[in-house]
Amino acid sequence: MIVSPCCRIIRTCCVSNRGTFHSRLAALYPSYIKIPNNHARIFVTKSRKINRPSSSFIIDTKEARQRNSDSSTVSSDLDEILKDQTPSAQLRLVDAYRRGFQSSTDSGKSSNKMQMWRTIIIKTILFGVVSCFTIVFLKKTLVGTFPKFLDQNIGSFAENTDVSFSDVQGCDEVKKELVDVVEFLRNPEKFNQIGAKLPKGVLLVGPPGVGKTLLAKAVSGEAQVPFLYASGSSFDEVLVGLGASRIRQLFTTAKQNSPCLVFIDEIDSVGGNRTFSPHHPFANQTINQLLAEMDGFQSKEGIIVLGATNQAEVLDKALLRPGRFDVQIHVSPPTYEGRIALLNLYLKKVKTGSNIDIEKLAHGTVGYTGADIQNLVNQAAIAAALRNDPFVEMHHLWDARDRLIMGPAKRRPLDDQTNRVSAFHEAGHALVALLTADSIPLHKVTIIPRGEAGGLTSFLQEKDISFMTRAQLLAQLDVLMGGRVGEELVFGADKVTNGAADDFRKATILAQNMVKRFGFSSKIGPRVIPDTQDEQLGEATRDLIDKEVDQLLNDSLTRVRTLLSSQSKQHKLLAEALLHFETLTKDEVLAVLAGKMKPPKTQSVTSKSTTLLPQLGPSTSTEIPRMIVSLIIVHVVDFISFFCPFKDTLHTYTHTHKLLFS
């Protein structure tokens, strides 16, 4: 076929610099006059693939390169190349070119530009539509909200409270200190006439729940002045300068309502130590504004700032200097008398039975704050309502106390071996507490699981203890070791469980404090070693501390082994009673050890909430009259106890009988 050789020739000779065929072919086919340069290049490249050595029209590659380098030769040789071709061959040559390139455009650049401009226009339109919708949405939602967010008026919290000192119980010493503040607010002129300067600020320091906020409201109520409340966290915002702006608003409102009381709760959020980090150059604006405002108003204006915190150590020293917070008052958890007053206050708000022993409750709530006692009474009332009881009884309060300390009670496991281990473990704790002179008095012992514990042995302090002797601390160690030793003596060293893990943790902490903080080690001496300095100690000192701690723990284990080994019979008797009754008070424990309260010989692991008797019902016809007599006795005793209550033991006994036969 002649087309292929012609294509080979055109690759080297028939395409001029301008990318056009010469006049002869153009004259015959005027529609194919102009050949774009890019088409010519493609045509030439494609034609290289055709290699027909037998054709006489194929030109040597070296010669072709020479002709391509000479542009004049390329232009002048077309007629010579085509002059020997027949018209049909020339037509085939042109047709081959037409079919290869007519379907394409003259240049691909024009279509690429159109596509680019089309994409730009579409994206611009979409961006404009989304922007319009966003602007409309923000205009509708944030036009009224954002200015309010910026200009939040903290002074809008100003109010007159009706709380008085009679509503605050358990902190009489603090109230006496605050009476002076009330007098400052009531009659500031009396102090101004004599030349005395009123305090600008009073700082209330104490743990959470002791009543700092209630005391501040009581001061405002007693003085009959407006009460402006602000939380320290309300001054912290993302926007720079907003906290300082709110400080200015607060004191502007205070000056407009003077005389008044400004109360800033959790003041450590805004008044903490200033930072000098270059990463937070504006972090100190809020506290600096607070310091400036407290310097700015005069004591004659009748404005007193009360701050409350439980982290006084983190406050900036400039805030605590005289002239700002002049007075610091420490609010501690209530004492024994304070707890009695709080119990009387909150128990009056619920329906209570006749067997409430407030003094005993006060002994059992050592360390409780006012909020804790309020929660205790509320939980007891909830429990009574859930059981459809008409009154809050003493056992409701004790159950609420155990629930708050250890968590809700769980159903006892059915595994007898687990029950036996728990019984001998708790019996060991209780027996050591009874037989150790300096231990905290026993309150009750139970094998009902609560929280993560399989049982509980609780204690009641007869009085508030501010200081503890070495003998008392050693007694606490012995009581903690009683559980493990109780298991070991009965089941053997290889059969003990991990139930004493928490006891060992508490004992280790106590022994470390005795050595490192309390000075009860003769080898370490009277020195305090904080935990943060352990890495700074020498290796010999650390080893000595470890040896002293180990000595205290091992000596305690030895003492408890000796004690319980000599009381193995009493230990077993108490454990068997716990297996039957599940929960025993101190009086019941003493009765069991004295032989006055014996469990039945046939042990059955039952719940005290369902029975205190060896059998759940009559097994023979002879026991039916006995059950009827028991029912009559229960109702008679319950009727008498309503007017003249007996001891808690009798009340609990009759109550469980009533549950059995109801």
From Swiss-Prot:
- Which family does the record assign? In the N-terminal section; belongs to the AAA ATPase family.
Which cofactors are required for activity?
Answer: Zn(2+)
Positions contributing to Zn(2+) binding: 425, 429, 503
Q: What is the recorded function of this protein according to its Swiss-Prot or TrEMBL entry?
A: Putative ATP-dependent protease.
Q: What is this protein called?
A: ATP-dependent zinc metalloprotease YME1 homolog
A cellular component term (GO) from this record? mitochondrial inner membrane
Q: Which residues form the active site?
A: 426
Species of provenance: Schistosoma mansoni
Q: Extract the PANTHER family matched here.
A: ATP-DEPENDENT ZINC METALLOPROTEASE YME1L1, METALLOPROTEASE M41 FTSH
Taxonomically, which superkingdom? Eukaryota
Report if keyword NADP is assigned. no
